[in-house]
């Protein structure tokens, strides 16, 4: 077939240059399903983009952002709603498990507050998790204390007092994006999208390296870059609800996995924040 390739000893549907299924139509629907119904689908296409986690106490199902139709659904929602399972689990007497799910619920609520920026709330989440990790064992009382309005407000004020120069932020995100793109380049994935973005990232890295023999040109470039960043930040604001939905879904689906402990949660939160930073920077470029 013209649509299949051999991979890992199996014949699978070959994706296009943008790593998209060739059977998606302009409305992001499967033309096979439209024409013949969902009985023609493979097992992968039947479950995609759904994901299921099987915990000892219950199963959780969620939609994943790898499908463009899911992004469209989230874009229509002001805020996503997720089930609270901690109370049900606490009734079973499994305190250790229920408190981890309560922690996830607290973080989901924290990221749902549009009165602060996404970046502020990600920082607050990370600092709270660090403190909780250092003050184990994790208890419901400890969570209520660290996520209380007064504690979060105090933490937010402390974060706002930290000097975070925008150029340093751009430079770090630039390096992060280049580092995370290495594996995609090795696999030859998303090249049409990644190559021009990475070319710009490399240009910025070189310009900010302070190796120029003309300091005036450096200052002009940095000033122009900051202006572009400010304009970008304003253009991004209408998409904050969608980005919050994406991040909160990542927290619900990836923060707490079967057999996770608090250290795993802390590491997963770091990855989610890195993921957001790299997506934001690729959009900027």
Residue ranges of model-derived segments:
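Structured, beta-strand-rich domain cores
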Residues: 4-31, 36
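Short Cys/His-based metal-binding microdomains
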Residues: 25-75
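Conserved aromatic-histidine-acidic binding/catalytic patches
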Residues: 33-37, 55, 92-95, 99, ...
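Charged, amphipathic alpha-helical linkers/stalks
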Residues: 69-154
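Hydrophobic, aromatic-lined core segments that form the binding pocket/scaffold
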Residues: 117-285
